Amino acid sequence: MTNKPGFFLGPTLFDDVSPEMSIYQEEIFGPVLVVLRVKDFNAAIRLANEHQFGNGVAIFTNQGSKAREFIHSVEVGMVGINVAIPVPLSFYTFGGWKDSIFG
């Protein structure tokens, strides 16, 4: 914590988020995870690609072929497979696409 003006939110999970919510529309950095549920694989790709920011996205699947297809189909800088947050290792770049602050 700090005594400087501003806002602080501890580690938080926002579940059942929809694209209409501001938590989805804004680019948030910190210990925050936003979870959207989609009907099918193509909807997941479409949702990621239609967003104005392209920093990172994650998908949970037990199908390696779908994981590879997802990686090559989404327009983001970082993709996580079966991890909550796509955090790069020290030898990978950290960056996004589109209007992402780090893009």
Label the predicted regions.
Residues 4, 8-103:
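Conserved C-terminal structural/oligomerization subdomain of aldehyde/semialdehyde dehydrogenase
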